[in-house]
Structure formats: structure tokens, C-alpha cells
Amino acid sequence: MAADIGRIVSELISFRSLLGKRVLSVGAGGGQFVGLYREAREVVALDNDPSALDALRERVRLEGLENRVTPLLGDLLLLPEGEKYDLLLFEFSLHEMGDPEVALKKACTLASEVLVADHDPSSPWASLVGEREKVARAWRGVRNRGALLEVAHGGEQIFSSKEELLRRVAPLGPEVQDNARVWAEREGLRIPMVYRFALLKGLSGS
């Protein structure tokens, strides 16, 4: 499977540079965006999935970033507020938070800036995997807080076979697998993906 991660990383860097910054990256497990960490001074890479953090550690090792990136198993809402960061990044993870507005409120107490990267509700990929409502809720939370800047981008999820697509969505349940099977038969193995970035002012108590 391949969304063009390199392209997304380049777009994120153009949107908001991490150069010299202390960064908290939320939903970092798996390590898809390790390339983004290269210019940061320090990255705490947070995820609540131990196996995803194992994958992150391996990618960090391969990129030679062990001295810059610290994987952390945990929950954003339970982090102590004494720790402060220059920037907090939601890596396509805000829509997975139980209450995105609560997560954003917490984020804004930890970092000077909050950067949200997530799927757009209009994205065919978000619809196919059954996440349109969660994504819409996440972006309502962003707009309720008031983004300083927001941009949209488009790309594709590209699969080499129907079997690869079905393996990718298998953890999401039989209904999503059925949706994916129908898409592959009707539309092929390239699924459009629309995503957005937003920047919010942080370091507030509310």
C-alpha cells in the first residue's frame, strides 16, 4: 500500500517547518512520517499501540535518528502539563481521539503551536474505511478552536492487488472489507485521498 508519504512529508514541511523545534508527535506509531523528524531538534513520538511503536523504533533505527527521536507509549490526555513543546503534531490521529475537542484543548496546554494533519470528510478513502463521520467531527473541533492557517491537498492510496487492499482494511471489519472489494471491482486499485493541514495557536489553559 502506498499513499505517497514522501509527498505528504514535503507538503507538511512546506506548511510548517520543524527546524530546530522540540516536537510532540501524536499517533506516531508505525513511523510513516519519520522523514519529517529529520529537521527537528527533538521528537517525542507518542502512540498507545506497543506494536506500532516497535515499527516506529525500527524505522528510526534505519534512518539513524535514535538520538533525536524518543518513542513513548501513552495517552495524550494523561501527559503531565509540565512538559512543554514548540509544536505538537497530530499525525492523521485526531479523528481517532474519543473527543477531538478535549484532545485539542490538552494539546494547546503542551505546545506553542498545534499542527493537525488528517483526512478530509470529502475524501473517498475516508468514506471507504468508514471514518467520514469521525473525520468530520475532528475538523469541527479544529474550527471551533479557530485555525490560524488551513490548507487542503489531494493524493491517492495505491495498491498492487485487490488482496493487498483487503489485507490493509481487514482490521476495520467485514463491512469495510465489502466496501473495498466493491471499490476494487468497479474503480480499480487507486483510491483518491483528500487531506488537510491546520495550524492552531497553543500554550493556553483552555
Question: What positions do the PLM features span?
Answer:
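Conserved alpha-helix/loop element of class I SAM-dependent methyltransferases that forms part
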Residues: 2-21
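A short SAM/SAH-binding and catalytic strip from SAM-dependent methyltransferases
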Residues: 87-99
